[in-house]
């Protein structure tokens, strides 16, 4: 098949796709934006309505929340917020009304309720200057869940859980003796009949009448010791509140607050929907035979005759006629009674449209009947419905729900009803930003409510105003805590546009109210058939979070209940035509349907070509179905996978494990200096770049009026107004990569609204460009490809093909100390002019200076503590005036192993009116940019999970070359392909070779791209052999290699794991306080761990002296290491090692256990172990980096805080809690690091 051209932005790609796109892909970050918008429009209102009105205990004062508004113009815009380390937020103002019932006085005031963080256009929040993302959480949906277990004899035991959104759980279980018991709110279990009696069905006869005679019910009644409603209430009260005196009144009010108080028990919209779905009569009698005539209660008409099988339409008709109990024949031909929860479809009973009443379709029939019996006029009915909306679809559980759930439990034993799969996406829902925020806001408001009630009782009634009663601290604190430290509020992964996009579409099962890593078993993590088209089966992290953190599929969306929906094309069964009508289905709805795949061939009219079609049948089974039975068809082959996975060409030819690595590694690619869009793309590149928010889009149609490297001005067509677009230049991302935008339009060019006018990081002509197209060959070369190592051409280094810019931020702050303020100055003690050459008169480095490690960035001095003066000195001081105050140098210096060019300086000071943390007078930030060329030790990868480390950079003249003299750019190991089964990379290389020489850019979409024949045809067109192999020559000898080699273009990424960030060496440095051993890790400037097994190795070789010095003078023999240093400096012989500090610690530990431990010589005389360092260490100062260890008599050891130069005070800042990997929260990050000992803390 010949590819056809497709226009993507400014680029034309040759597409191999055969399936027409019926539905455009939705905006990929709408998920976040829509949810936040819902919160501002409706979510906030719901919370205020729930809390309002607040009454005091006497019922005299009433506080109502009338209205709220968010100020449109925040104090700082997005840029300023990032620069000043503040939160991008707008003030929330609430109109509050206070009513005094006795005097009838009404006071109304607008109350400021704190600053509310705003979402940026790209779906992120800026909290304390850092961009953060709130990820979506997957939680168990509220509802009624039934499960089955088998006892030792193989008998089925059913159990059930009734889960609300918030409130007490109800759990039913059947034991081997057929007794059904209930647990209320996780307390001890009791017979289920006790609960029924407490709900008003007091006698045995009433209960049997209610549920029908069932052997389980009779067994339970036998076990039940209570006989009346009052006894049952007391029995429940004793179990729930042991130790409190039980009274019937208390018991009643306890049950009322537990289940029937909307403030305590909330099903939420989704809970009511799930309850009605599970417990409705219609679903339970469907397909069963009626055991008695079913009669319409209002007309007396027989709806179903005895012995008739009930179909779907009849079952719904029976339910909507208000019938709530039906006798049916079970599978075992017993007659059983089925009880629903008495909800009906309101539209069947009311002739007019009720949309504007905002009542849900399903309503509680007894209340509806009462309204219809009382009123006959439409207006009256409308008003009554409005007034009793809360009773019609109650937010809390009602008695009918409880009885229906118990009836279901009894019916299950007779094979009536289904058990639930809790990993099914119909039973898991997504909580997005809006809902998470709403929950947090609700917590804050309920805390505030308590405060308001207390203040109402204390304050003078006449003087009370809304402002005086309301304390906004709890609300502000709840919001701040959520954004600052919730597990779901994560530091945005800003490596490249794709990683930003994916982060916003992440679904996490962890977090508050979710699962924990330890408890999650295999089932929760596994791919489920309901994930199809909703959650990507490929993209998930490797490691402890596998399967718990997922990504939304490309076309999926979240509905109002939080369930994930996937779009399908409707099949018109009458005509047998696949229409272009799109319907979104949840996993529940899909389970009952027959769905064809997107690549099923259709003719011109949209009819299926084949008579028998491979489909997904009921409950996810794959089977062949006749064409006339198909209900829906997939929209696109891409709908199964996520955005990152859809960017892997030939995904269908890769093993799933490697595809997972490929999808994850694309997110780790560093933006390169010279971007290069892939020759072999999938057609997803344009949309993902556009939606990620890193490129600039034109807001209106117009003409480019003027443009420079940092601004584009467009003259609008409509009204001639000018739109200005500011471009970001060399800004630092969260991960230290470089954000730089550049225009891709020219003056006078016409643009349409939504066109890309400027490229961002990792984009090229509006397409995502994460790496570079490299000419590669699959062959071995002198063992340099062993174990996936990569051999590269020096040309890539020289031409900056794989060079990236990295920007680091360093800050110095001048604080107030006890001895006086610190000062930022150029006047630093004991520093030569050479070191100050790049500092300006303030002592701050100039922009453009080139710095190496150890150079001063910001000169700063701190007052030194002065000793107590003697009387004579004080007298002299008084006569001759103040001697210069003693200060020490605490300048900010470039840390070890870092260097680069200063690209930006920011100075904030109190005097200029900047907001600074308490105790800070001045804050200076310096930004150092580094150009990092590709280097030995850097990690590179393709898009198919084929990763490796660069082992050697070879001169171009030594690289293998093609017949025309072109040297290869990269040599990869052919052995990396077969065992890994990622054949996609080979196809990519073949097609890349052909496309490059034909001058094509190719789009080969996943599951709908080029096949082997297409690739061979393309190779033939380009004049290559159909095998795709070519003759290669050795660059050193010029001889041809024995065999032909696969050569072509592969898209290679340079990953974030760069050798410059990892390589590290230490001379002398900080030591741990207790054990006196060197710290570990690059951040602490630590040493190399010499562990137990390394000691064995030296012991095995008998290297006694080496071993002794490693365990003593190179580690924790405090005196010995100082003396050794001294001897090396003076050129003397190294002294005998002393006793290691850890040995002394061990002895102390044993002594603390009351063991008298002594060290004896061979002659049994005791060896005295000195407690502290004696004066014989002399005066010595060890310098390393920017920390000076002065040993004046006793050795003073200073421990640096992580990357903090100010050794005097160790301040903990918020950044210390920032985790670089959004999937590890900070407490675990420290547990996972392999520190030498706990004392490093």
Swiss-Prot record:
Residue spans crossing the bilayer: none
EC number: 2.7.7.6
Function: DNA-dependent RNA polymerase catalyzes the transcription of DNA into RNA using the four ribonucleoside triphosphates as substrates.
A GO CC term attached to the entry: DNA-directed RNA polymerase complex
Main EC class the enzyme belongs to: transferase
Swiss-Prot/TrEMBL GO biological process terms: DNA-templated transcription
GO molecular function (one): ribonucleoside binding
Keywords of this entry: DNA-directed RNA polymerase, Nucleotidyltransferase, Transcription, Transferase
InterPro entries found in the cross-reference section: DNA-dir_RNA_pol_bsu_external_1, DNA-dir_RNA_pol_su2, DNA-dir_RNAP_su2_dom, DNA-dir_RNAP_su2_hyb_sf, RNA_pol_bsu_bac, RNA_pol_bsu_CS, RNA_pol_bsu_protrusion, RNA_pol_Rpb2_2
Gene that encodes it: rpoB
Quaternary structure, from the entry: The RNAP catalytic core consists of 2 alpha, 1 beta, 1 beta' and 1 omega subunit. When a sigma factor is associated with the core the holoenzyme is formed, which can initiate transcription.
Catalytic reaction list: RNA(n) + a ribonucleoside 5'-triphosphate = RNA(n+1) + diphosphate
Name the record gives this protein: DNA-directed RNA polymerase subunit beta
Pfam families attached to this UniProt entry: RNA_pol_Rpb2_1 (PF04563), RNA_pol_Rpb2_2 (PF04561), RNA_pol_Rpb2_3 (PF04565), RNA_pol_Rpb2_45 (PF10385), RNA_pol_Rpb2_6 (PF00562), RNA_pol_Rpb2_7 (PF04560)
């Amino acid at each position: 098949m010949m590819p056809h051209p497709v226009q993507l932005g400014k680029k034309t790609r040759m597409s191999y796709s055969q399936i027409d796109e019926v539905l455009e892909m939705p905006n990929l970050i709408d998920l976040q934006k829509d949810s936040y918008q819902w919160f501002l429009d409706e979510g906030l209102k719901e919370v205020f309505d729930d809390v309002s009105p607040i009454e005091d205990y006497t019922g005299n004062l009433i506080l109502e929340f009338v209205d709220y508004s968010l100020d449109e113009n925040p104090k700082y815009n997005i840029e300023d917020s990032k620069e000043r380390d503040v939160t991008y937020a707008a003030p929330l103002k609430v109109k509050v009304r206070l009513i005094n019932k006795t005097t009838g006085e009404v006071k109304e005031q607008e109350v400021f309720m704190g600053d509310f963080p705003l979402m940026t256009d790209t779906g992120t929040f800026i909290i304390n200057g850092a961009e953060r993302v709130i990820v979506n959480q997957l939680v168990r949906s509220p509802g009624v869940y039934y499960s089955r277990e088998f006892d030792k004899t193989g008998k089925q035991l059913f159990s059930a859980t009734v889960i609300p959104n918030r409130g007490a759980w109800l759990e039913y279980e059947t034991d081997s003796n057929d007794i059904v018991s209930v647990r209320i709110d996780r307390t001890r279990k009791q017979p289920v009949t006790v609960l029924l009696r407490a709900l008003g069905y007091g006698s045995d006869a009433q209960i049997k009448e209610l549920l029908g005679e069932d052997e389980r019910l009779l067994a339970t009644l036998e076990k039940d010791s209570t006989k009346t409603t009052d006894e049952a209430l007391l029995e429940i009260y004793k179990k729930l509140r042991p130790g409190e005196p039980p009274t019937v009144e208390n018991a009643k009010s306890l049950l009322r607050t537990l289940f029937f108080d909307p403030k305590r028990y909330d099903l939420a919209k989704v809970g009511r929907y799930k309850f009605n779905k599970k417990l409705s009569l219609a679903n339970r009698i469907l397909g069963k035979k009626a055991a008695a005539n079913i009669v319409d209660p209002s007309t007396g008409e027989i709806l179903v005759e005895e012995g008739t099988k009930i179909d779907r339409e009849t079952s719904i008709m029976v339910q909507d006629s208000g019938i709530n109990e039906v006798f049916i024949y079970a599978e075992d031909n017993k007659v059983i009674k089925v009880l629903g929860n008495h909800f009906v479809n309101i539209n069947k009973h009311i002739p007019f449209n009720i949309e504007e009443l905002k009542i849900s379709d399903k309503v509680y029939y007894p209340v509806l009947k009462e309204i219809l019996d009382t009123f006959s006029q439409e207006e009256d009915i409308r008003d009554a419905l409005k007034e009793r909306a809360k009773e019609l679809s109650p937010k809390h559980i009602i008695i009918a729900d409880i009885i229906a759930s118990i009836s279901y439990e009894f019916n299950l034993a007779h094979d009536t009803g289904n058990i639930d799969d809790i990993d099914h996406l119909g039973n898991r829902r997504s909580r997005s930003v809006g809902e998470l925020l709403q929950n947090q806001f609700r917590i804050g408001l309920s805390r505030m409510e308590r405060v308001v009630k207390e203040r109402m009782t204390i304050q003078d009634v006449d003087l009370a105003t809304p402002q005086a009663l309301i304390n906004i601290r709890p609300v502000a604190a709840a919001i701040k805590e959520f954004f600052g430290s919730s597990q779901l509020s994560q530091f945005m992964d800003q490596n490249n546009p794709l990683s930003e996009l994916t982060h916003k579409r992440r679904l996490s099962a962890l977090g508050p109210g979710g699962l924990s890593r330890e408890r999650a078993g295999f089932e929760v993590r596994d791919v489920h058939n309901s994930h199809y088209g909703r959650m990507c089966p490929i993209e998930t992290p490797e490691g402890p979070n596998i399967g718990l953190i997922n990504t939304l599929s490309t076309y999926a969306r979240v509905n109002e209940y939080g369930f994930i929906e996937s779009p399908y094309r409707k099949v018109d069964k009458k005509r047998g035509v696949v229409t272009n009508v799109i319907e979104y289905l949840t996993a529940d709805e899909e389970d009952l349907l027959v769905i064809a795949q997107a690549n099923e061939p259709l003719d011109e009219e949209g009819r299926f070509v084949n008579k028998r079609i491979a489909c997904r049948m009921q409950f996810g089974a794959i089977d062949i179905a006749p064409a006339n039975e198909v209900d829906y068809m997939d929209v696109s082959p891409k709908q199964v996978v996520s955005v990152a996975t859809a960017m892997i060409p030939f995904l269908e030819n890769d093993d799933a494990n490697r595809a997972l690595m490929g999808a994850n590694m694309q997110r780790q690619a560093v933006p390169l200096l010279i971007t290069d869009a892939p020759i072999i793309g999938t057609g997803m590149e344009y949309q993902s770049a556009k939606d990620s928010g890193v490129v600039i889009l034109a807001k209106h149609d117009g003409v480019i009026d003027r443009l420079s490297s940092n601004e584009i001005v467009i003259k609008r067509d409509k009204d001639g107004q000018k739109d200005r677009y500011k471009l970001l230049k060399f800004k630092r991302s969260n991960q230290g990569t470089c954000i730089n935008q550049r225009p891709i339009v020219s003056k006078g060019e016409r643009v349409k609204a939504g066109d890309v006018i400027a490229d961002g990081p990792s984009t090229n002509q509006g397409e995502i460009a994460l790496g570079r197209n490299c000419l590669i060959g699959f062959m071995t070369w002198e063992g340099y490809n062993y174990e996936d190592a990569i051999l590269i051409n020096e040309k890539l280094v020289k031409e900056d093909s794989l060079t990236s810019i990295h920007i680091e931020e360093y800050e110095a702050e001048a604080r107030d100390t006890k001895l006086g303020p610190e000062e930022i100055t150029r006047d630093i003690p004991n520093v030569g002019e050479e070191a100050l050459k790049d500092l300006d008169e303030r002592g701050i480095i100039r922009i453009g200076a080139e710095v190496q490690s150890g150079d001063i960035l910001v000169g700063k001095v701190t007052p030194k503590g002065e000793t107590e003066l003697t009387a004579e000195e004080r007298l002299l001081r008084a006569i001759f005036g103040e001697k210069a105050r003693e200060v020490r140098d605490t300048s900010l210096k470039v840390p070890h192993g870092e260097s680069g060019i200063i690209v930006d300086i920011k100075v904030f000071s109190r005097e200029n009116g900047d907001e600074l943390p308490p105790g800070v007078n001045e804050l200076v930030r310096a930004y150092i940019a580094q150009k990092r060329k590709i280097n030995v030790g850097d990690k590179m990868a393709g898009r198919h999970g084929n990763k490796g480390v660069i082992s050697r950079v070879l001169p171009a003249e030594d690289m293998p070359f093609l017949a025309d003299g072109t040297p290869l750019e990269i040599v990869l190991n052919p052995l990396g392909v077969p065992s890994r089964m990622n054949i996609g990379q080979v196809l990519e290389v073949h097609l890349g070779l052909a496309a490059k020489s034909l001058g094509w850019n190719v789009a080969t979409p996943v599951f709908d791209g080029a096949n082997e024949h297409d690739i061979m045809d393309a190779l033939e067109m380009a004049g290559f052999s159909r095998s795709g192999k070519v003759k290669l020559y050795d660059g050193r000898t010029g001889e041809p290699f024995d065999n032909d080699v696969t050569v072509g273009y592969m898209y290679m990424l340079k990953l974030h794991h760069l050798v410059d960030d990892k390589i590290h060496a230490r001379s002398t440095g900080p030591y741990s306080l207790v054990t006196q051993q060197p710290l570990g890790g690059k951040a602490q400037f630590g040493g190399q761990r010499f562990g137990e097994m390394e000691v064995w190795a030296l012991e095995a070789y008998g290297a006694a002296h080496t071993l002794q010095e490693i365990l003593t003078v190179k580690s924790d023999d405090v005196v010995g290491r100082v003396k050794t240093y001294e001897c090396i400096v003076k050129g003397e012989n190294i002294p005998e090692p002393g006793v290691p500090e850890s040995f002394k610690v061990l002895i102390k530990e044993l002594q603390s256990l009351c063991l008298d431990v002594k060290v004896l010589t061979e002659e049994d005389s005791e060896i005295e172990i000195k407690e502290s360092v004696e004066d014989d260490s002399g005066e010595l100062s060890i310098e390393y980096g920017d920390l000076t260890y002065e040993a004046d008599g006793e050795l003073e050891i200073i421990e640096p805080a992580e990357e903090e130069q100010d050794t005097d005070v160790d301040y903990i800042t918020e950044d210390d809690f920032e985790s670089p990997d959004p999937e590890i929260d900070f407490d675990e990050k420290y547990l996972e690091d392999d520190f030498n000992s706990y004392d490093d803390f």
